[in-house]
Amino acid sequence: APQVENPYPFPLDTFQTFAFDAINKKENVLVTAKTGSGKTLVGEYQIKVSREKGKRVFYTTPIKSLTNQKFHDLKEMGYSVGIMTGDIKFCPDADIVVMTTEILCNLLFARAQWATGVKPVQSEWLASLSLNNVDAIVFDEVHYINNIERGKVWEQCLMLLEPSISLVLLSATISEPQALAKWLGDLKQVPIHLISTQYRVIPLKHTVGNEMIMDAKDRFYPDAYNRWLLSLEKIKKGVADHKEAVRDRRRAGYESTTLAKKDRKYSFVHQLNQTVNSLDEKGLLPALVFVLSRKKCCEYAAAVESSLITSSDVASIRHIVKFHLHRFPELETSTQYHELMGRLEKGVAFHHSGLLPILKEIVEILFGRGFIKLLFATETFAVGINMPTKTVIFTSFMKHDGQGMRMLRPDEYTQMAGRAGRRGKDTEGLVIYLPDRDPSPLGDVQRMMTGGQQKVSSRLDFGYEFVLRTYYGKDMDWKDLVKTSFWYQQHLANVASYQADYDAELAKRSVYSIDDAMGEALAERRSIEDTIAVSVNATKRAAQKKLDEWKQAHPEPEWERAWKNQAAYAVHTRTLNNLSVHMECLARYEESVEITVGFLRANGYLSTQLGLYACSIREGHPLLMSWAFHTKLFHNLDIPQLMACLSLFMGGDEKDAPLTLNDSTFISDKSVSAIKELTVYAKKLEAEEPSYSNWEMDFYWLDVVIRWVSQENAYQICRDYGVYEGNFIRAMLKLSNLAIEWCTMAEQAEDIQMLDKLRDIQPLIVRGIVVPDSLYLRM
């Protein structure tokens, strides 16, 4: 390892030493390491080095909660820190600005668009978020570049950043990171150091029941898992026999409460309490329990019987909660608040995306300080939030991914399990599988726990959003931009791979010495042979005669040898044809983008005011929302009805059946007419558009928005519609951004009447519990 000065009061790991050396040379770094390995220190060292030079640093994260937490952590280190997310904007000219990656991407495109007359949304904030004097950008959780929906944002940022800005990329372990590193090295023409480590500072032990199924060296023990499955089967049989005995006694006229109570000990809740008590006795708390369902998070937290903390801890919790939440008196009417407070006084809590943001943060603060001994959380808690624990418990390995239920991928399991084991506190982290339903099969579990990590693939797409952003950006020709992308590097690699396969297949086929003319003659014989096989009588005799004539015209041994080889020759020919099709498709990517350009031009979105509107939109559907404004479709609606129409672009909440327009009670006839007209236009575009896009509008929030903008109570609305309070806040903040985008188009159009109508819209939306605030900003 290179010799570097260590500014910290603890020894550096080897991979950190290599990373520090690269940063000192102002060279780029890509670190891939497991959760809890200390890769965050690399980003913090870059900040230290840049600040010593008097330079600024941007720090990007994939989620708002991680952004808020990182803001607090860096502020605690004594730095001048700003924060920029979709909801919170504070001190964008600070020495260090923490932001979501989408904010950085919007800034990079906005810089190119200002020069062409496009006014991006919230341009005053973006203008103040200057790249001037920025020495480096830290991309935390950069493995998000692999995310199907959002990965393109990371790729676009890396494409558009100037080579003079140093890059520190921090990633979970990924497969074949060399391709990503090579692309960045070629693109920036700056050396990049790929520093990968599989080492875990705190080893993990993975268990089921009393069986260890994977050790600290990642050796999986299938026999142990099978023994546990067998023990579960015996228990299940015992429960079934017991229930039958209860039924027999009841049929005989007896009522045995003793027997009836026995099956409770086999219930999941009983096993959960038994496990928690055992962990408490053995000093293996705190524990993080992953429950991949928001509803069950709350249910299981409520089912914990024991108190896991002292009366002194309870007093401390009350003091901390009062200190942080006294500014939010409206919480007293929140069901979630009272549910959570009841759990907290036992040292138990829950954390999921539907929880009020400030309640999520109070849980994080209390967990970080050691007052929460048992936390039930969904997967989002594993993403980046630096909250290690002693023990991790999985209640299921199955998750819903929007398409259906599936097993966790190896990378997802690794990240979640990796929360176990606290550096400097534990010698070992414990991971327990305690299924709340039938356990996953052995093969699925083994693949999940020992399988390889996901290969990094480009998620860049060339839909209308990409074309609009590049078309209205100064010096942004899409053809040139594509050639700087990770997608293009992978595209060239695929072309080369297919060409190599084609050449190899051609060489294999050439062994059989069958040219095209021979191939046609052999195909003729195959046809005759097929006729003989299925014919009878005169037809068969005629075909046999044809075969004899064919053999006379094509004498042995050359033709007989060719006939024997023709099956293999045909297989190689089919493979070559398939490869040709793939190569042709790869060669035509420019054509597919040109079709999208033609689609936008034909519908009036290029070199037009309509196109400028569309280019301004980030939250809503660019084409539909801009068209609705351009045609004044919603202009005659009052404010609650206009906001309801904008809610069409907010996306729905999880419901078994999507709502329809007819399900709305409060929508006006004028709004219904406008929505139907917009739906017709959307169907027209969907029929014309060359590639798949989402043209669906969602009616889930119509009545919720009308009632909220009409000044009704948030908690009552949530109760009436069964909406999680956290989801409600997130949706209303998105509505606030949609209203800002609508105002931006009105400013571009100099539509004084619309601007006057919406002058006071924000206080109607952003009020009460709907506030873009974070406890981390005030700590």
Regions found by a protein language model. Name each.
Residues 1-29, 55, 118, 203, ...:
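Helicase-associated low-complexity/disordered flanking segments
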Residues 10-203, 209, 286-291, 298-312:
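Conserved P-loop/Walker A NTP-binding site and adjacent catalytic elements of P-loop NTPases
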Residues 58-60, 68, 75-84, 267, ...:
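Conserved C-terminal RecA-like helicase domain
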Residues 159, 166-168, 173-185, 189-303, ...:
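Conserved interdomain linker/interface between the two RecA-like ATPase lobes of SF2 helicase motors
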Residues 387, 391-401, 406-447:
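Conserved segment of the helicase C-terminal RecA-like domain
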